[in-house]
Each structure stands twice: as structure tokens, then as C-alpha cells.
């Protein structure tokens, strides 16, 4: 989860998120250099003693500052498109879970091997145990295996919601009447948090998502289904 | 609850030089390239303003060049690490079984 006042991305828990972090670093370096150049130009503009206002006939400069941004955009677009298509790859998921957004909780359905359906409500402050996270912890977590491709089918029962888990690089809209699909493969066990990411009413901030990722061997023993 | 990490140096307020792989390396080499290019230009031409422009241009070009070079090598290294990790896992899993790749290789070479 994020620590207080965190601005940067959370550590990656899936290969896609690792790629996204790499792309973010790449784009940020290009942005830094452009900002540096602009600041330098601004400094020169503010400190020049030149008063000539002849600003016509600068064909070479105009050519450079047309072609160079185009090249920069290509340098940014190519990795971006690569990751975009990577997220759409079919990776043969071994497990499918449905996630249904409601006002203001999530319902999860594990229907592959049985009919497990449960709701996931945020823990109210009065019900928090010492060590629990305010506004993040829920009564029933989504338990999933590590290193197994998982397919999430996301929809909504009422208004727009969005199922997001930043550390996995996931954010998928929950739209009533539509099934959206996202897949992921987690690379390390742990408890990971997310929050609803589409305004959905008074308690939009109070319907978090909590994933509990456990080793595949333990998951296969069926702790999820022993409710 | 994770504690906030200590404040890291962020150039222009957003480029985290300490925690971004290759950033510190690129910025340092870029600064060196900027000083060399700018100062060298000044030594040859004695033009201050133009030398500053060359210095800034040198900084941008050297930083960009080092950045791409370092990131390419970093990506290659990560791929190699991933392959090595997978192979070690496979070796542990399949050692002694009929799926052991070393056994298949030794069997084919002895034939």
C-alpha cells in the first residue's frame, strides 16, 4: 500500500506494473530534459539585453523545433504502445473471478470450482482492530494465488465504479450492463490495497478493494472455500 | 503501516534521482559532458553566451545518450535475471525426473 504523502508509484507486484514503472521513468527523464531546456530559454529571455524585435525568417530554427518534438513524441509513443498491447495479450488464465460493484461495496464470485459468492464491505472505524488500516481494510478479502494468471470480470449492478489495485497496475471500469475483463499475474505474496476509482455517490471513498495473494500450494488446499 | 521513506533528492521537484535506476548515472555524466563541452567551446571561441548554449545542449545530449545506453543494459540484465530465476526454479523442480533438461541433454549426447 502507499505510505502517507506518497506521490510516486507503488512497488510492482506484476510484470505489467514493472513495465509501467520503467515507462514512467523513461517519460519522466524526457520531461525533465524538456523542462530544463525551457527553463534555460526562459532565463535567457529574462536576462537578455537585446532589443531587436526582428522575429521573421528563422527557417532553420522552425524546422528544428517542428521535427524535434515529433521525434520526442515517437520516443515516448513506441514504449507506450508496446505496453498497451502487452496488457491485451491472451495469457491463458487459470482462474476467473467476477467482481461486481454496488453502492457501496464489492461482490466477488468464485464460480470456477464451486459457487462461492461474498460481499466485501469496508470495515467501519468502530470495528477496526489495532493494526488495521482505516478506510482500507475490509471484512472479506479477495484471496488469490500467486504466479497464476487470473482473469477478473468486472461489472456493476447500479452506477459506474472502477476496480483498481495500483500495485498490480490494474484499473478497470465497472459499468452496468457491460462485462469488462482484465488479467494479471501476481509475482509475490502479500496483502494489496486499492480503492474505487470512479465517482459513485456519497460513499465512493469507502468501498476499498483488498487482495490477499497466497502461494499456489496453499490456495489449492482450499482456504478460500472453507468459509 | 509502512513508514514514509526518507526524502530523496528530486531534480526540479519530480525526478527522483536516487530511486530511479540509471538516473543518477545519466545526470552525472550529463553534467560532466556539459562542463566539458561548454568550457571547451569557450576556450576555443571566448564566446560566453554561445558556450553556455553549447553547455546546455551538451548536457541534454549526453544525459539522453547515457540514459538510453544504461536503460538498454538494465533491461537486458533484468531479462537475464528472469531467465536465470526461471531456469533455477525448473532445475529444482525437475531434477531427477524424466523432465530434467540436463538428463535429456546428457542422454542425447551419449547416444
From Swiss-Prot, chain A:
Keywords: Copper, Electron transport, Magnesium, Membrane, Metal-binding, Mitochondrion, Mitochondrion inner membrane, Respiratory chain, Translocase, Transmembrane, Transmembrane helix, Transport. Gene3D superfamilies: 1.10.287.90, Cupredoxins - blue copper proteins. Its EC number is 7.1.1.9. InterPro entries: CcO_II, CcO_II-like_C, CcO_II_C, Copper_CuA, Cupredoxin, Cyt_c_oxidase_su2, Cyt_c_oxidase_su2_TM_dom, Cyt_c_oxidase_su2_TM_sf. Cu cation A2 binds at residues 196, 198, 200, 204. Cu cation A1 binds at residues 161, 196, 200, 207. The chain crosses the membrane at residues 15-45, 60-87. Mg(2+) binds at residue 198. Residues 1-14, 88-227 are mitochondrial intermembrane. It is a multi-pass membrane protein. Binds a dinuclear copper A center per subunit. SUPFAM superfamilies: Cupredoxins, Cytochrome c oxidase subunit II-like, transmembrane region. GO terms for biological process: ATP synthesis coupled electron transport. Its cofactor is Cu cation. GO terms for molecular function: copper ion binding; cytochrome-c oxidase activity. Belongs to the cytochrome c oxidase subunit 2 family. This is Cytochrome c oxidase subunit 2. The gene is MT-CO2.
Amino acid at each position: 500500500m502507499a505510505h502517507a504523502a506518497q506521490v510516486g508509484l507503488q512497488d510492482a507486484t506484476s510484470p505489467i506494473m514493472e513495465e509501467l514503472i520503467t515507462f514512467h521513468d523513461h517519460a519522466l527523464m524526457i520531461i525533465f530534459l524538456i523542462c530544463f531546456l525551457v527553463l534555460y530559454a526562459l532565463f535567457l529571455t529574462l536576462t537578455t539585453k537585446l532589443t531587436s524585435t526582428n522575429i521573421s525568417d528563422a527557417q532553420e530554427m522552425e524546422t528544428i523545433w517542428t521535427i524535434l518534438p515529433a521525434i520526442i513524441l515517437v520516443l515516448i509513443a513506441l514504449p507506450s504502445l508496446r505496453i498497451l498491447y502487452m496488457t491485451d495479450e491472451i495469457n491463458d488464465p487459470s482462474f476467473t473471478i467476477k467482481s461486481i460493484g454496488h453502492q457501496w461495496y464489492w461482490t466477488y464470485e468464485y464460480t470456477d470450482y464451486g459457487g462461492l459468492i461474498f460481499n466485501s464491505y469496508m470495515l467501519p472505524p468502530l470495528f477496526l482492530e489495532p493494526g488495521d488500516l482505516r478506510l482500507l481494510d475490509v471484512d472479506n478479502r479477495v484471496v488469490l494465488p500467486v504466479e497464476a494468471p487470473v482473469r477478473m470480470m468486472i461489472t456493476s449492478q447500479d452506477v459506474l465504479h472502477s476496480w483498481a489495485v495500483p500495485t498490480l497496475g490494474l484499473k478497470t471500469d465497472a459499468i452496468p450492463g457491460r462485462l469488462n475483463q482484465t488479467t494479471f499475474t501476481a509475482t509475490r505474496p502479500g496483502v494489496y490495497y486499492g480503492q474505487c476509482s470512479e465517482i459513485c455517490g456519497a460513499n465512493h471513498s469507502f468501498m476499498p478493494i483488498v487482495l490477499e495473494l497466497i502461494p499456489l500450494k496453499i490456495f489449492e488446499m482450499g482456504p478460500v472455500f472453507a468459509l | 503501516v509502512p513508514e514514509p521513506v526518507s526524502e530523496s533528492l528530486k531534480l526540479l521537484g519530480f525526478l527522483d534521482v536516487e530511486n530511479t535506476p540509471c538516473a543518477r548515472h545519466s545526470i552525472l555524466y550529463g553534467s560532466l559532458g556539459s562542463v566539458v563541452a561548454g568550457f571547451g567551446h569557450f576556450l576555443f571561441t571566448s564566446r560566453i553566451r554561445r558556450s553556455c548554449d553549447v553547455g546546455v545542449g551538451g548536457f541534454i545530449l549526453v544525459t539522453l545518450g547515457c540514459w538510453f545506453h544504461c536503460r538498454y543494459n538494465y533491461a537486458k540484465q533484468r531479462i537475464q535475471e528472469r531467465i536465470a530465476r526461471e531456469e533455477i526454479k525448473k532445475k529444482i523442480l525437475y531434477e531427477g525426473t524424466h523432465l530434467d533438461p540436463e538428463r535429456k541433454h546428457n542422454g542425447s549426447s551419449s547416444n
